[in-house]
């Protein structure tokens, strides 16, 4: 066991320096930002920058810990889901992005208002807010727990203080610039996460005295690199996983304000589509590297008789068996994986609440809008804090399974709503949509809870999302009548875009006229 553990105070110093660099980037990018830049970044982001930064947002600290930790139980089976993502990303690029750009939206749920009505917009936003709040705080909790155990607990500080410090860091660099800032900070942090991933793989290969080719051969011998599930009755069957992967990508990326707010900040539709396809390919390589890391951790655990499993394995190996420098790399990479998902969630939740629920862009003057937006931002930070403490109490062993389970219930109604709007021209009752969106997850829960009695050996896995979406679609069909409705440009969103451009123009003129 390593006796060269890095001092917690020194680790904290490096974390503080890293955060200082993020604050500098945040200050630089938000210097001339107008209020609309918080929501769509002035629609001037470069597609390559967004694609690279979205890798970090898509993965998060949960991927950094849970995906490698799950290799012992399911091998490389998670790759089935990620391969399925390719089809989902193609649907987003070919169907959803053209819709969002045609409607010129600040929030993607404004499209539901043009198709069904204002209650549907609020329902879509409400399910996104519930889903992203729970998912983001589950991700946040996992990383906060590890950072607390490694850095602040040895200094005698309580868990709640660790969570508060990290949330304060995120709040400070997102409160002004919003999307305009996080496009840049997420790029910086994704680079840090990937560098940390590669260094950890290299250090484990060295510790095991293996070349990459020899490591792959060893993983094949032990069965850890198995990908395809062959039992049709099991939840890990390959066809289920591929299909679930496609719909998870559509729902958790294409119908998610956090992920799409960066895409619709790109200058052109073509650029946004290039970003989505580039992201799809990069994700295949990055997840494969995480699975390789997980396989190496399992080999290391077998070699050293380690009892740690699941989410506890990676931190146990780093803190107990590898050189002190690797601890620093691990901590900085973990923070780099955490911040892009947490900062994007905080910004997107603020944006969706302000636009979809409060109709902020049609209210008062710019100063009052900014005051309300800041209050909402602070409110979500406080909610994040409370939920992190709840997850501390739950303390699930594998957070990625919990997050995907939550997504199956909360993204299903969104999937059904958008599918009905795109695939049919029927006129659904706007008043019925909120009730349908609530009924579908409840019916899914009944099926899930009684699946053994209903289906015998057949296990419902991630296809719960598809079932939820299908129930929503069917109920919408029953509550609709023949018609000729489609997604139409929203006059409100056009007016909002004009106001934003006007504010940006006024701000630019003011800066130009300022005396030297």
Predicted regions and their residues:
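Long, low-complexity, intrinsically disordered segments
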Residues: 502-516
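Membrane-embedded helix-loop-helix hairpins and adjacent transmembrane boundary segments
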Residues: 2-493, 497-498, 513-516
């Amino acid at each position: 066991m390593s006796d060269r553990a890095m001092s917690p105070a020194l680790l904290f110093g490096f974390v503080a320096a890293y955060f200082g660099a993020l604050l500098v980037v945040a200050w630089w990018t938000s210097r001339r930002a107008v209020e609309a830049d918080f929501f769509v970044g002035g629609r001037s982001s470069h597609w390559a920058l967004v694609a690279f930064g979205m890798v970090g947002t898509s993965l998060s600290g949960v991927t950094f810990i849970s995906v490698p930790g799950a290799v012992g139980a399911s091998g490389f089976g998670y790759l089935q889901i990620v391969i399925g993502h390719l089809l989902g990303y193609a649907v987003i690029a070919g169907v959803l992005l053209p819709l969002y750009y045609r409607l010129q939206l600040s929030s993607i749920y404004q499209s539901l208002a043009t198709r069904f009505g204002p209650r549907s917009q609020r329902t879509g936003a409400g399910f996104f807010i519930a889903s992203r709040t729970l998912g983001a705080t589950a991700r946040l909790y996992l990383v906060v727990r590890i950072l607390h155990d490694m850095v602040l607990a040895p200094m005698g500080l309580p868990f709640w203080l660790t969570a508060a410090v990290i949330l304060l860091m995120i709040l400070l660099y997102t409160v002004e610039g919003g999307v305009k800032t996080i496009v840049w900070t997420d790029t910086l942090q994704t680079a840090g996460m990937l560098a940390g991933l590669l260094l950890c793989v290299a250090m484990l290969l060295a510790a095991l005295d293996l070349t990459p080719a020899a490591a792959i051969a060893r993983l094949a011998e032990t069965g850890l690199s198995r990908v395809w599930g062959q039992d049709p009755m099991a939840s890990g069957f390959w066809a289920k996983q591929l299909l679930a992967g496609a719909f998870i990508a559509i729902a958790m990326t294409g119908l998610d304000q956090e992920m799409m707010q960066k895409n619709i900040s790109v200058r052109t539709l073509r650029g946004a589509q290039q970003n989505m396809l580039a992201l799809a390919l990069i994700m295949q390589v990055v997840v494969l590297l995480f699975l390789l890391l997980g396989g190496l951790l399992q080999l290391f655990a077998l070699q050293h008789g380690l009892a740690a499993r699941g989410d506890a394995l990676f931190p146990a190996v780093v803190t107990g068996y590898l050189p002190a420098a690797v601890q620093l790399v691990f901590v900085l990479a973990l923070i780099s994986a955490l911040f892009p998902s947490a900062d994007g969630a905080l910004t997107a939740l603020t944006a969706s609440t302000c636009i979809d629920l409060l109709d902020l862009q049609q209210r008062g003057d710019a100063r009052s809008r900014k005051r309300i937006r800041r209050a909402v931002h602070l409110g979500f930070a406080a909610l994040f804090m409370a939920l992190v403490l709840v997850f501390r109490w739950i303390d699930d062993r594998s957070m990625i399974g919990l997050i995907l389970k939550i997504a199956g219930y909360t993204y299903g109604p969104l999937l059904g709503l958008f599918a009905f709007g795109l695939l049919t021209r029927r006129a659904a009752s706007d008043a019925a949509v909120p009730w349908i969106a609530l009924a579908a997850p409840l019916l899914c829960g009944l099926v899930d809870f009684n699946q053994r009695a209903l289906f015998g050996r057949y296990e419902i896995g991630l296809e719960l999302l598809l079932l939820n979406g299908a129930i929503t679609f069917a109920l919408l069909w029953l509550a609709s009548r023949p018609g000729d409705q489609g997604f139409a440009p929203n006059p409100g969103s056009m007016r909002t875009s004009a106001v934003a451009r006007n504010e940006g123009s006024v701000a630019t003129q003011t800066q130009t006229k300022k005396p030297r």
